[in-house]
Each structure stands twice: as structure tokens, then as C-alpha cells.
């Protein structure tokens, strides 16, 4: 499955986490970037050791079709496997350890976690799909008695709200009630702020060796993975994407 931009001559492919792909596609369309989005299943997050191999497999499929490929993932529990892949092939990924960093900024997540280590984060995607992505995946629909085992160390739910719609507010409230924890909402500006955010050329310091072009991976520059991936440590998803689409 791919989510093409309006342009018919896209020269850049972004292999993206399915949890981010709709937002990424929308931003690329708003910015007029000639980008095709190729999402991978969001439930790979439950098997993070499979993320890097899945990304590499997709790179092999797409390399001959695009001038450049970028990775629409943070580290996402791969413990450096995505950075190793990016370094080896000369690719750039999104900044941060996980998608919470992408939306809110690593400093904000660190601050919230330090203030209350037992913070359970939800993005809009997780909020909307909580029943399927969390409740059923953990087996709590079949074994609700396991709820204390899964969440005993959590003390609050923080929803990182990119779109604060009535439907999502209700979903976040329901999710917190299901877990039995108080809900706090942190508006991350997200897509509303991103619409007026970075355009071409944003995302300074995206790193050398920006892309594996046709033939995937020739000329990986120093620091192309971990250093480049950390290029847009704050500034919202648009700024992070600008660093992928228009690296310096």
C-alpha cells in the first residue's frame, strides 16, 4: 500500500510507520512535496525487532523507483537497528526514540516523564484505536484480570493531542477510564501548528549522506543515520519531515 502525494513525478519515497503515515501524507500534500508514502503495519511496534528488517525489505523493493528514500520512523524500540540500517545505506530517519518525541519534542517527553515516571502516553492514533491497538492486543478483552499486571506501574495517562476533536476527547477519556488512571491532555500543537510551520529548507543539520538513491545505499555519509535522525529534535512533525525531504 502506498499513499501518493498529488505529484505524479515523486522522486522521494518515505517508508513510514502506519501510525504516522496519514499525518505524514497530509503534511506532504499541504507542503506540495513530491513524495510517496509507503506505510508499514503499525502493529510492528508490538514486534520492534521486526521493524528494521521490514524497512530494509521495503527499501529493496523501492530503490530502483526513486532518487531517494527516507525513513518515517523514530527508533521505535529497535535499540539502534534502524540507525545501523540508516548508517549503512545513507538514509535519514525521523528524530527521537519514539513517535512521542516526533509529535511533542524529546525535551517535552523527558520533562513529562521526569515529573511523573509512571506516565502512559497516547497519541491521536493510539487514542482513536485504543480498543484494537492496546486493549485487544494485550488480550484484555479476553483476560481483563491482567489489567493490574500491565498497568500497575503507571500513574497517569497523557494524551499528546495533535487534533483535539470531540471524538478524540471522548476516546481519550474512555481509554483512561478503561485503564483506571487520571487523564491529562497535552496539546502538542501538532498538525494545526505544522500547517504554518517549516517549509522547504527547514530542518537544519539534517546530516551528510542524505539518501540511498537508485541502487540503494551508495555513498553513505558520516553520521547519516543517528546524527541525521536527531536533526529535528523539536519543531513538530512538519519540521522533522522537512529534514527528510530537503536535507542539507
PLM features: what roles do these ranges have?
Residues 80-133:
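Long, charge-dense
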Residues 15-22, 44-45, 72-82, 100-101, ...:
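Gly/Ser/Thr-rich loops at beta-strand to alpha-helix junctions
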Residues 161-203, 227-248:
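C-terminal, charge/polar-rich interaction regions
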Residues 1-31:
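N-terminal basic/disordered segments at the start of proteins
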Residues 48-61:
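Glycine-rich, highly charged phosphate/nucleotide-binding loops
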Residues 34-51, 185-189:
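A short beta-strand-loop structural module common to alpha/beta enzyme folds
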Residues 114-169:
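A conserved mid-domain beta-alpha-beta active-site/ligand-binding segment of alpha/beta enzyme cores
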Residues 198-230:
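Long, intrinsically disordered low-complexity tandem-repeat segments
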Amino acid at each position: 500500500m502506498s499513499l501518493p502525494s498529488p505529484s505524479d513525478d515523486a522522486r522521494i519515497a518515505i517508508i513510514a510507520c502506519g501510525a504516522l503515515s496519514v499525518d505524514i501524507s497530509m503534511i506532504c500534500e499541504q507542503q506540495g512535496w513530491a513524495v510517496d508514502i509507503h506505510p508499514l503495519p503499525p502493529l510492528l511496534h508490538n514486534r520492534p525487532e521486526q521493524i528494521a528488517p521490514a524497512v530494509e525489505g521495503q527499501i529493496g523493493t523501492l530503490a530502483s523507483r526513486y532518487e531517494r528514500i527516507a525513513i518515517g520512523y523514530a527508533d521505535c524500540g529497535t535499540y539502534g537497528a534502524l540507525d545501523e540500517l540508516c548508517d549503512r545505506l545513507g538514509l535519514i530517519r525521523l528524530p527521537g526514540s519514539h513517535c512521542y518525541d516526533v509529535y511533542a519534542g524529546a525535551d517535552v517527553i523527558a520533562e513529562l516523564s521526569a515529573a511523573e515516571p509512571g506516565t502512559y502516553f497516547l497519541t491521536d492514533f493510539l487514542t482513536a484505536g485504543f480498543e484494537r491497538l492496546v486493549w485487544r492486543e494485550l488480550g484484555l478483552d479476553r483476560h481483563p484480570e491482567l489489567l493490574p499486571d500491565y498497568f500497575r506501574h503507571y500513574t497517569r495517562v497523557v494524551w499528546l493531542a495533535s487534533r483535539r476533536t470531540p471524538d478524540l476527547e471522548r476516546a481519550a477519556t474512555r481509554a483512561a477510564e478503561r485503564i483506571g488512571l487520571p487523564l491529562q491532555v497535552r496539546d502538542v500543537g501538532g498538525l494545526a501548528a505544522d500547517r504554518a510551520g517549516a517549509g522547504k529548507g527547514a530542518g537544519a543539520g539534517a546530516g551528510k549522506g542524505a539518501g540511498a538513491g537508485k541502487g540503494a545505499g551508495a555513498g553513505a555519509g558520516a553520521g547519516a543515520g543517528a546524527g541525521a535522525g536527531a536533526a529535528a529534535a523539536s519543531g513538530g512533525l512538519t519540521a522533522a519531515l522537512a529534514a527528510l525531504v530537503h536535507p542539507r
